Amino acid sequence: NDLFNQNVDYIFLPHVIELEITPGYIHGYTCPSTTTIPDIIRAAFENVSEKLLTPHIGLSEDLIETTIKEFGRLALKVGIEEKVGINAGLVALSHYRMFRELYYEFGRKKLKDLLKKPSVIIAGRPYVVYPPDVNIALPRKIVSRGYNAIPADLLPLLISDTNHSRNVWSFTQEINNALEYVKKYPNFYICFVSCFSCGPDGTMYHHFRQQLEGHTFCYLEIDSHTAHAGFETRVGAFLDIIEERHRNADKTIKKEFNQIIVA
């Protein structure tokens, strides 16, 4: 509404249907609720709906050609040549892929250092995990206690024997990958941030608990009533448990070492 009041010419609000498909999966769909946001806004602001630019974007191999054609149609709508829109779309896709590769390379380089000390993987959907007004300063709370806070999408893909082919949601696949890291590396813990009434997250919660049986983990659910105090208490308790487990592990190692010396 603020943008409409500023009398902008257009608002770019695409339907992002599918992201790149992760190896081992058959689809990489985004959230069905967020995909329909452009339609909801169009219905809510009928008198200015012509200002909304809502192309359908899919980044999987099956949809990329259609996406490029959408850029051409978008160009015609704003009064420029179709080929200009297509070329602009191709440049945008190239920059996006370059950024992803640099981001993943950064993750690969940092992984060895991150494994040396207790770290918390923050897993969830990017529109929940990243905006500070939504995540209620969760990364800062973790870092302030001396832990690394690792976004789940920074982690390189771990090959697992588990068949996840029925999982068609891109962000849920990222969470699955994070679970594999927690199971494989003792210094890695996970904080799963979920949205209230999210269907895929509701299913993922049960899988999450089964996979991490015996592990220390944190599950946070965000809704309109979530406040700093509740987050602070739960995250603090989670980190306290991690610290206690490490203290007990250190005591056990020292005890075993002393027994060896005495023997």
Describe the residue ranges of each PLM region.
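An N-terminal assembly and electron-transfer interface module characteristic of large anaerobic redox
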Residues: 1-263
